[in-house]
């Protein structure tokens, strides 16, 4: 049942469905929630988002005995770590600091992340890495998400979750479903409007400024 999305079909200022590799799918409402590909997908609808795509690397170690019961985050080093059911340590840190759609990273970030981990837990320096990869993050300008209608009737957008997309999925989906069903934002998502950047109402919780790689 896999389909490759080509573009949204816009007629007279309204989205009437999507063009896919298996033909056209008509819809009264179309929701876009594609994380790191947000800017490219919405560009096909003629929109330019206040979002940049950046690479975030993740790492997995060899299997070890249970040592981490949950998830540990280290704000001082921007590091997080958990342990999988197979015993591998799953960890990561900061983005690679340049725009990219490539799902691979660079070595300076590998060194930085591993040093951050050993600062928190020196003993993991002896663990051997077995896998690493890069995922594409949809980094908004203020570090906060967007859940809103677009200027195109029938087209809705949910993105800009930065690092927190996977962890925020339940709440994100609940708020987005409410918007799609009622055409009004959920009470917990009223501030996540698309036009907040134009109006000067950014949600910069960290106080880092309007620069994606600082969030």
Task: Place the predicted regions along the sequence by residue.
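Active-site substrate-recognition segment that forms the wall
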Residues: 9, 14, 24-153, 213-215
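Short, small-residue-biased leader/transition segments that mark boundaries at the very start
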Residues: 1-5
